[in-house]
């Protein structure tokens, strides 16, 4: 009997321990934070690089006194033709930069590239800011200064000339570069807008090639054709001589 009682007690203790463990697991599951897989938009946004252009202190004057805050201007890009700019204000610098990055990722602009440079020359304007952008050869590098350099680098352009012709305000310069880069178009796009259809640039032969082909055809003409042309010229000259002699004889007879 004593052995049976001991077995019953041990089994009851085991059951109670199992119940306690199950309740603990349930409680921990309630407070566990669910981790969801990252969306594609977050994964794409992580590819962007950031550059802080300016950080300045701003003040707001009220009846109670002056309130100081920090304003940051940040440029974001993936170096593959996507660039964005954003501004942010906060009581501390890191918070202002975070706000600016968040706004820049919402205001992305696509830029048309031609290998490592831009397709053509363009003048971007915004307010009093003006910037001239020109294409350059491979190996030239980025010849630009100020806020425009950050925009050009993060856009993926590595060979370009840029010159500021207007205001030196950072925001105006950045917006002027955005206006200039976004207005650029490739040759195919211009042809589509003008004629409503695309052309294969490979099929269109340059003028020099056409001239060379024409010269080659002239050289390859057979000798018989040249002889026929010479005979026709001689016959025409004889006919002219006969007409002239007939006219002279008629005038003498009169």
From Swiss-Prot:
Residues 8-25 have a biased composition (Polar residues). Residues 1-45 are annotated as: Disordered. It comes from Mycoplasma mycoides subsp. mycoides SC (strain CCUG 32753 / NCTC 10114 / PG1). Keywords: Ribonucleoprotein, Ribosomal protein, RNA-binding, rRNA-binding. InterPro entries: Ribosomal_Su5_D2-typ_SF, Ribosomal_uS5, Ribosomal_uS5_bac-type, Ribosomal_uS5_C, Ribosomal_uS5_N, Ribosomal_uS5_N_CS, Ribsml_uS5_D2-typ_fold_subgr. Pfam families: Ribosomal_S5, Ribosomal_S5_C. One of its GO terms (molecular function) is rRNA binding. GO terms for biological process: translation. The keyword Ribosomal protein applies. NCBIfam families: rpsE_bact. Belongs to the universal ribosomal protein uS5 family. Part of the 30S ribosomal subunit. Contacts proteins S4 and S8. The N-terminal domain interacts with the head of the 30S subunit; the C-terminal domain interacts with the body and contacts protein S4. The interaction surface between S4 and S5 is involved in control of translational fidelity. With S4 and S12 plays an important role in translational accuracy. Located at the back of the 30S subunit body where it stabilizes the conformation of the head with respect to the body. Residues 48-111 form the S5 DRBM domain. One of its GO terms (cellular component) is small ribosomal subunit. This is Small ribosomal subunit protein uS5. It comes from the Bacteria.
